[in-house]
Amino acid sequence: MGEIQTLNAKQQAGKPVIRLSGISKSFDGKEIIGNLNLDVNHGEFLTILGPSGCGKTTVLRMIAGFETADNGQIVLDDQDVTQVPAEHRHVNTVFQSYALFPHMTVFDNVAFGLRMQKTPAAEIEPRVMEALRMVRLEKMAQRKPHQLSGGQQQRIAIARAVVNKPKVLLLDESLSALDYKLRKQMQIELKQLQRQLGITFIFVTHDQEEALSMSDRIIVMRDGVIEQDGSPREIYEEPKNLFVARFIGEINVFNATMLERIDEKRIRAEIEGVESVVYYDKEAQAGDKLQVLLRPEDLRIEEIKESEEKGIVGHVTERTYKGMTLDSVVQLDSGMRVMVSEFFNEDDPDVDHSLGQKVAITWVESWEVVLNDKQED
């Protein structure tokens, strides 16, 4: 296990551990993956995120060798493995069901892969115990899987996968069977383990919060195509289109019309009947239809009198107290419902808005993301 921990990242820098080139895959005549290209770097925690049926698990299964690509090439650590069977790829998979052998002890479950590889008997025990120490379950070595909690079973499945010293560890929605509190705990532990091992993790999930909290990099997929590739912050704060924006967290989408360009970075636009200045450095003409995107936490609401008209206005129709935040729904005169999330401060007399209260909606200039009609989907 020490070999894994001492991977020389400098030697491998700049060279992907996995390269998918022009990959396509169809089932029963329906294309699931179309001309997909993806590089995965050494020591990276990459998450493939997308709705059910987007092709993310198919990509994982093709990397593992459980599915064969119809077209394209899969390269693993400079070796073309497109036609190499799963058992000869230096890749291990942790499944959603964990797939532990119920009749075997924890020790034997973890040792199974080593024995299948005909590892010398003298090496097996120290390697298994080292793997169990990494997941803090060395004292459970002689127990059976049914004697363990869900979180412990998950850690055993990971220990069984990493004991073989894979170049890449694949995780297929492997936290989804856990309850919320345990899932949050395992997210932290999984990221810590990945840093400790220094090997590449490729994690598949449909849970946006999970992806944002664990990943170095996120691939957002839809219908077999990569919609966006970037860091968690880029994906959340700079979505490339409305699909990504709406899939990753809550977002408000205001329809806007460009009026004029102010300078290289800013334009004047009409948003909900109100002239506003927004940041948009791409080409646009007066009259172009745009969308202005703002997260609920980026918006501010100011209580105003019924007689006042102050920018974009509406009335509070819902309030939800969530401990740290107070979430409000504001209905504009146009009928649009706007979500606003404010940090709750019990000493602030203005934060707990009354239902029916008239409010003005504002935000810090440049916090918005502006898309044109071509980026709508």
Curated annotation (Swiss-Prot):
One of its GO terms (molecular function) is ATP binding. Keywords: ATP-binding, Cell inner membrane, Cell membrane, Membrane, Nucleotide-binding, Translocase, Transport. Its main location: membrane. It is found in: Cell inner membrane. ATP binds at G50, P51, S52, G53, C54, G55, K56, T57. Residues 18-248 form the ABC transporter domain. It is a peripheral membrane protein. GO terms for cellular component: ATP-binding cassette (ABC) transporter complex. InterPro entries: AAA+_ATPase, ABC_SmlMolc_Importer, ABC_transporter-like_ATP-bd, ABC_transporter-like_CS, Mo/tungstate-bd_C_term_dom, P-loop_NTPase, PotA-like, PotA_ATP-bd. The keyword Metal-binding does not apply. Its EC number is 7.6.2.11. It catalyses: ATP + H2O + polyamine-[polyamine-binding protein]Side 1 = ADP + phosphate + polyamineSide 2 + [polyamine-binding protein]Side 1. The keyword Nuclease does not apply. Pfam families: ABC_tran, TOBE_2. Belongs to the ABC transporter superfamily. Spermidine/putrescine importer (TC 3.A.1.11.1) family. The complex is composed of two ATP-binding proteins (PotA), two transmembrane proteins (PotB and PotC) and a solute-binding protein (PotD). Part of the ABC transporter complex PotABCD involved in spermidine/putrescine import. Responsible for energy coupling to the transport system. This is Spermidine/putrescine import ATP-binding protein PotA. It comes from Vibrio parahaemolyticus serotype O3:K6 (strain RIMD 2210633). The gene is potA.
